[in-house]
Amino acid sequence: MREEDLDWEEIGLRVGLEIHRQLDTSRKLFCRCTPELVEEVPKEPKVRRKLRPVQSEMGEFDPAALEEFKRDRTFYYLADGSFSCLVELDEEPPHEPCSEALDVAIKVTLLLGGSVVDEVHVMRKMVIDGSNTTGFQRTMLVGFGGEVPTSEGPVRISTVCLEEDAARKVKGRDQDLEVDYCLDRLGIPLIEVSTEPDIRTPEQAREAAERIGEAIKAVGGVKSGIGTVRQDVNVSIEGGAVQEIKGVQDLNLIPKVVKYEALRQANLLRIRDELRERGVSETDLIDCEPMDVTDVFEDTDSEVIRRELERGGVVYALLLPGFEGILGWELCPGRRFGTELADYARRRGVSGLFHSDELPKYGISEEEVEAVRQRLGAEDGDGFVLIAGPEDRVKSAMEAVKDRAIMALKGVPAETRRARKDGTTEYMRPRPGAARMYPETDIPPVVIDEDRVKELAEELPEKPWERKERLAEEYGLGEELVEQMFEHGVVDEFEEIVEETGVEPKVAAATLVNTIPRLEKDGYPVDNLTIDHVKEVLRLYAEGAIAKSGIEELLGALAADPDSDPEELAEELGIVMASEEEIEEVVEEAIRRYEDKIRERGMAVMGKIMGEVMEVLRGRADGKRVSELVRERIREISGE
């Protein structure tokens, strides 16, 4: 199935969102450390840890945690007293939750039209990928309900939570089986807004994510910049399974991620049907065991295999009955079913795999392929995979590949996947289950009293989507200009400038979203500009003291010398509007130069005269007034 064949309603597309944003508080969520990232990662102290899953209160292991444990990874944590303490190292109990962060979460809940809980209970969410020293992430439900509007209908809000951000990955070694983490990011407050799976199209997913992001930003108290916003997308289709896609950084990438994931699931369902039609059963695959075929590749031309053998590694093959043609089946652009198997293999510490649908290739000869098929007892229609590397890792990777091949008979396994820059995704781990969550025993519940909620409700800003409509209507602005002001975060400044200077709204908006960014691009130190600078420049324009063309020049000069007086600077730059007498003098001088041609050609020379006059005045005169004067003098001379 191709992308253009997808009908969202027909395939039953369902999408939910989880929007995360770091909060700009004075302390971390569960300690007093400063919530900032360090410029230089410390080398010491360095703490070594191994993490293991524990059973839930029901005696169950979370499948995602169990899968991580099978990778047998080692983690090293780099800490420094300037940004972390014993809480981050899990050597001291957590402190009470940050009240600033809690206030932001309450306000976001209220702005979205949701309800705030009476008591906040901190929970532990098991995570043993090394990003949390404790082996779990602390999270708390603050609100539920509400909705955001989209052009395709409202999207309901499921929950608003507060959680601690994860440690920052610094470096991975040996196929990520050893990882260094910096503890500066661990514990920074993070708000998470989750939706119900109400979204029905890829574009609606982007729109809903934008609306939620606007609401969080409108409340304030949030960080900005790279890495402060993370968007997870949950996607499923009819007959498929929910996939949690992590880390979609770019808002505009969301539609592509949704499309490609829907396409991937649709093709996995087709593969399931094809395997069933071929009569492949789970028993057929269970009976297949990995086989050592190292001797087949003793003199191989494959650089990958030869390198592993030189390191003392082995080569194993696994028969996949009935999988011929399936392994090379494209699921979405650039991703085949064989790629899915390779993802599972890599999680066990090998560099990848070869599959029969792509062989002979990569230095593996036809003779070697045939020798492997004979060793495995492969028949027509069968496929196989090859993995090279250390024997223990190869065996573990083969186990994962075999499990994934068996899953193909059932359709689409529920997974947590990572978003890639091209919009495709790759396997990370199984979807977590209910056994993942259990109560935090070190922090008592936080009671949210009604007075606190009422006080915060009085501080709520206007809903961003309603404010956009009002700005467009009240100030006569186009939708694109309004959107640009929101993107640049200058809406408050815009309204303040218009109210205090009386300048035309379109000029004020264009100055904030076009002129100042252009000056920055040209190398001007625009960080030196304050809103008072902008107001004074636009006031001069509104009063007719400078021309519109002088706005950018004056702002650039003020950026370079912010202590200057704007009016005096305008005089020095020669951008003060010309007086009526000066305009008349310049016009008269041009008329004298062209008097003979005026008598010959009349109005035909008006364009040349206008050009010269405006060049002399350098935009310091209203073009309409200049045109009137020139036209009047030409008529007097030519008699037209």
UniProtKB/Swiss-Prot annotation:
This is Glutamyl-tRNA(Gln) amidotransferase subunit E. Its EC number is 6.3.5.-. The keyword Ligase applies. Heterodimer of GatD and GatE. It catalyses: L-glutamyl-tRNA(Gln) + L-glutamine + ATP + H2O = L-glutaminyl-tRNA(Gln) + L-glutamate + ADP + phosphate + H(+). It is an enzyme of class 6 (ligase). The lineage of its organism: Archaea, Methanobacteriati, Methanobacteriota, Methanomada group, Methanopyri. Belongs to the GatB/GatE family. GatE subfamily. One of its GO terms (biological process) is glutaminyl-tRNAGln biosynthesis via transamidation. Disulfide bonds: none annotated. Keywords: ATP-binding, Ligase, Nucleotide-binding, Protein biosynthesis. The keyword DNA-binding does not apply. Allows the formation of correctly charged Gln-tRNA(Gln) through the transamidation of misacylated Glu-tRNA(Gln) in organisms which lack glutaminyl-tRNA synthetase. The reaction takes place in the presence of glutamine and ATP through an activated gamma-phospho-Glu-tRNA(Gln). The GatDE system is specific for glutamate and does not act on aspartate. SUPFAM superfamilies: GAD domain-like (SSF55261), GatB/YqeY motif (SSF89095), Glutamine synthetase/guanido kinase (SSF55931). PROSITE patterns: GATB. It comes from the Archaea. GO terms for cellular component: cytoplasm. GO terms for molecular function: aminoacyl-tRNA ligase activity; ATP binding; glutaminyl-tRNA synthase (glutamine-hydrolyzing) activity. The gene is gatE.
